[in-house]
């Protein structure tokens, strides 16, 4: 199975009837409109495609087709994968398609970014999405994203960060001269800028669950971040 190019819709024949659901071949898993699914790629060496099912149809011969909206992985986007992209990150695109239901391999869950960061255990079927992506132009929505640390990068939930009890900003251990092992042993952390501040109040636990839960954040244009990271990657 291969994705069609954005803007090139598959031919849809008349005489189709809409179905409420489809059972994935060889399983008891039922797919309905609104579900997210894993679809078999044309290249067996690549990970499965991820799509959101918009509609399910069958023709007179009971050939079932699914109308889907593709999720793109960062490496499939015009900007490419960057250091702040998580391994399970996806972009909801404006690329719609029609594919055979037989290409569906399984179901998955695409969480909101905040809900994903609250998962106690991330399973193989768990993904997250924080951006929508226009496949033709490479534009992202929203065009601004929260940034943290001295490096002013968005939060990657795969990376450990520590929170300063003074300014409440989050930091990568490497950016403040610590190893990950040292950071894991911390009960409290105060950044260099706050360490001389006598008004910093020590709490029993200075860590909230994750940067995604913070209300006060700095914002940066996402396009600028992609450009900065592309220079870093050279």
Curated annotation (Swiss-Prot):
SUPFAM superfamilies: FYVE/PHD zinc finger. This is Chromatin remodeling protein EBS. The gene is EBS. Disruption phenotype: Higher H3K9K14 acetylation in the genomic region of the FT locus leading to an enhanced accumulation. In ebs-2, acceleration of flowering associated with a shorter adult vegetative phase. Other developmental defects include smaller leaves and siliques, reduction in seed dormancy, plant size, and fertility, and partial suppression of LEAFY disruption (e.g. lfy-6) effects. Belongs to the SHL1/EBS protein family. It holds the Pfam family BAH. GO terms for molecular function: chromatin binding; histone H3K4me3 reader activity; molecular function inhibitor activity; transcription cis-regulatory region binding; zinc ion binding. Chromatin remodeling factor that binds to methylated histone (e.g. H3K4me2/3) to prevent their acetylation (e.g. H3K9K14Ac), likely by recruiting histone deacetylase (HDAC) complexes, and thus regulating the transcription of target genes. Negative regulator in developmental processes in a gibberellic acid- (GA-) dependent manner, such as germination, flowering induction, and flower organ specification, probably by modulating developmental gene expression. Involved in the chromatin-mediated repression of floral initiation and controls genes regulating flowering. Residues 29-144 form the BAH domain. CDD domains: BAH_BAHCC1.
């Amino acid at each position: 199975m291969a994705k069609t190019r954005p803007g090139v819709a598959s031919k849809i024949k008349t005489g189709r009837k809409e179905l409420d659901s489809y059972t994935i071949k060889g399983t008891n898993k039922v797919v309905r409109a609104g579900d997210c699914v894993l679809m078999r790629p044309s290249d067996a060496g690549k990970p499965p495609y991820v799509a959101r099912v918009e509609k399910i149809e069958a023709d007179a011969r009971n050939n079932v087709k699914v109308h889907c909206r593709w999720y793109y992985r960062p490496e499939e986007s015009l900007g490419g994968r960057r250091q702040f992209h998580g391994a399970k990150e996806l972009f909801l695109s404006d690329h719609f398609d029609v594919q055979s239901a037989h290409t569906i391999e399984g179901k998955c869950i695409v969480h909101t970014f905040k809900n994903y960061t609250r998962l106690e255990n991330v399973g193989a079927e768990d993904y997250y999405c924080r951006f929508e992506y226009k496949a033709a132009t490479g534009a992202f929505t929203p065009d601004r994203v929260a940034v943290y640390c001295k490096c002013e990068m968005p939060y990657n939930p795969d990376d450990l960060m520590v929170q300063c009890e003074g300014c409440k900003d989050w930091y990568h251990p490497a950016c403040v001269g610590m190893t990950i092992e040292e950071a894991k042993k911390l009960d409290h952390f105060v950044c260099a800028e706050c360490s001389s501040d006598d008004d910093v109040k020590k709490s029993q636990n200075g860590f909230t669950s994750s940067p995604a839960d913070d209300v006060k954040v700095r914002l940066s244009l996402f396009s600028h971040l992609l450009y900065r990271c592309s220079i870093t990657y050279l």
